[in-house]
Amino acid sequence: SGMYLTVGTGIGGGIISDGRLIHGMEHPETGHILIPRRTGDDIPCTCRFHQSCVEGLASGPMLERRTGMKGKDIPADSPVWDLEAFYIAEALVNYTMCYSVERIVLGGGVMDNKFLFPMIRNYYTELLSGYIDMPQVKDTDTYIVPAGLEGNQGIIGAMNLF
């Protein structure tokens, strides 16, 4: 089982369980799970439906709202990346709790900033607080991984549907 999450203009994803894509009444709205805001973060969320969903707090448009810059132009040492990593990690903890996946793959334009991965993994471990005591979850270097396929995963995935 696994999950792919794209973090870019929006946040979305899919979950595979027993070799099948999870699909119910609608597609999973992985970007619209509600997460607690970090204390002191009072910049209005970019989601018009929620005030604290992961998409509204951590997508590319929110990075631009916070800094006035596109994600690719924000320096790696900007404090906004710490907040970004925290919010993504909050979401990943929730996905782990709900779907119990064996691996989480992160892609999308925001995740092209590879320096985010260690930050996300550290917050993930901190937020999970040892609740799930499984070796594969504890080894965050292999549990939370960057997407491969050089940014073509969406196109290749779509082609595999035909």
Annotate each predicted stretch with a short phrase.
Residues 21, 37-162:
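ATP-binding/phosphotransfer module of carbohydrate and carboxylate kinases, centering on a glycine-rich
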